[in-house]
Amino acid sequence: MIMTEVPEGLNYTKTHEWYRKDGNTATIGITDYAQSQMTDIVYVDLPKVGDKKKAGDVLLTIESVKSAEDVYSPITGTVTAVNEEVAKHPESINKDPYGSWLVKMAIESEGEHLSASEYRKLIQ
């Protein structure tokens, strides 16, 4: 079994997104487990700054050599920043899924989320 990294201090979703709260801002990415299942990531279709999303809405799409996967918004809010570096170098998600954030959003409300220990149980 491959061990995947699940850092403490982040919130996780059942659809394999992570987010870190900093005041009223959420920084969002995909988990180590998600990137390992997708294999080599080749393209990220980021949303636009100003896009409004509800928790559970499709936030963006990531394409790998294996498949195209939707990434779902873990919160309800407005996109305030996108990581253009990830768009230019999508493989960075494979190398560092927790350092390669995808978007930042202003939080209106949070959706359902899991702690690190709950997420570890989900992916075992």
UniProtKB/Swiss-Prot annotation:
GO terms for biological process: glycine decarboxylation via glycine cleavage system. It comes from the Archaea. The modification N6-lipoyllysine is found at residue 66. SUPFAM superfamilies: Single hybrid motif. HAMAP family: GcvH. Belongs to the GcvH family. The glycine cleavage system catalyzes the degradation of glycine. The H protein shuttles the methylamine group of glycine from the P protein to the T protein. This is Probable glycine cleavage system H protein. It comes from Thermoplasma acidophilum (strain ATCC 25905 / DSM 1728 / JCM 9062 / NBRC 15155 / AMRC-C165).
